[in-house]
């Protein structure tokens, strides 16, 4: 079967690309998705405690003013379920599902020079051809399972945050070992600790974690973000990573010690990723990085 464009993945990028290719350009488009529904990383990563580390009012689509203003986020940092609900809302709003096939994983994509076409095959023995092939698989959906000797014969239950089962799992009064303290590890550990008999965390490299200061969003805040739609949309295009905050242009060494502490304390209390934007050289000079990093020692 021939399509003008085939998109691999139905996460944030894949859904947006489908809308652009099909609705804006008019291409005959197909999305191939391995999962059972839309969501991408937010479909696969459904482990306890899973939530976004970017603020909800900027971790969303801004191409549609109607969608931006009609969807009401509940928290500063949304949970996995809320983000998945948001993507389902967008999919329904734009009628995207009719051009998505689920439960199909792309096994091969080969470019046919003589025909100027891509030949795409899935694990369900389906073959498609297209002129444009767009990869929207992202970087957060591939699992990394350690090659642990004896794992296959382990009689207890073992799980991976990136492929969490759909059913509810109880860890109450159990001995649990956790390997890794990346973003997922940091989020799941405190949730597990509430019910387990014991939790042992195996950590190779400690990561620096800043308080999120998560909270429920007030009606006033929600109204302000809706009213500032155009401003926020333009701001995201001009800030690093599209995070919605500017990095300081001043070095940490341009400030006195007391002034540095005041700036850092304010950012620490505010929480979130903007903490790294206090000074221009936090991630560029080791000496500056140490000063900023040591702030956490005050709060231990």
List the model feature ranges, each with a label.
Residues 117, 157-163:
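Short gly/ser/thr-rich secondary-structure transition/capping motifs
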Residues 161-162, 172, 224, 300:
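Intrinsically disordered, low-complexity serine/threonine-rich segments
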Residues 163-168, 188-189:
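Catalytic micro-motifs at enzyme active sites that drive phosphoryl/nucleotidyl and oxygen chemistry
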Residues 168-176:
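Glycine-rich NAD(P)-binding loop of Rossmann-like domains
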Residues 176-196:
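Rossmann-like NAD(P)H-binding beta-loop-alpha module
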Residues 1-5, 10-151, 167-168, 181, ...:
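N-terminal FAD-binding dinucleotide-binding subdomain shared by FAD-dependent oxidases/monooxygenases
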């Amino acid at each position: 079967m021939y399509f003008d464009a085939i998109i691999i993945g139905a996460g944030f990028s894949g859904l947006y690309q489908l809308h652009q290719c099909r609705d804006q350009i008019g291409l005959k488009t197909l999305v191939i998705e391995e999962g059972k529904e839309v969501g991408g990383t937010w479909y696969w990563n459904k482990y306890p405690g899973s939530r976004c580390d970017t603020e909800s009012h900027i971790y969303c689509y801004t191409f549609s003013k109607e969608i931006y203003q009609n969807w009401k986020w509940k928290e500063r940092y949304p949970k996995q379920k809320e983000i998945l609900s948001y993507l389902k809302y967008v999919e329904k709003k734009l009628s995207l599902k009719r051009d998505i096939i689920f439960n199909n994983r792309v096994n091969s994509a080969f470019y046919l020079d003589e025909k100027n076409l891509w030949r795409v095959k899935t694990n369900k023995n389906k073959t498609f051809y297209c002129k444009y092939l767009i990869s929207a698989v992202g970087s957060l959906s591939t699992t990394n399972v350690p090659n642990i000797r004896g794992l296959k014969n382990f009689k207890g239950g073992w799980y991976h945050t990136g492929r969490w089962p759909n059913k509810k799992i109880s860890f109450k009064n159990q001995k649990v070992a956790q390997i890794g303290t990346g973003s997922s590890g940091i989020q799941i550990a405190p949730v597990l600790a509430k019910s387990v008999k014991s939790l042992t965390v195996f950590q190779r490299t400690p990561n620096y974690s800043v308080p999120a200061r998560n909270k429920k969003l007030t009606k006033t805040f929600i109204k302000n973000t809706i009213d500032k739609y155009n401003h926020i949309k333009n701001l995201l295009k001009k800030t690093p990573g599209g995070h919605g905050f500017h990095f300081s242009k001043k070095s940490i060494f341009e400030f006195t010690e007391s002034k540095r502490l005041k700036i850092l304390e304010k950012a620490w209390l505010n929480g979130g990723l903007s903490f790294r934007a206090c000074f221009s050289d936090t991630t560029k000079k080791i000496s500056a990085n140490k000063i900023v990093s040591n702030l956490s020692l005050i709060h231990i």
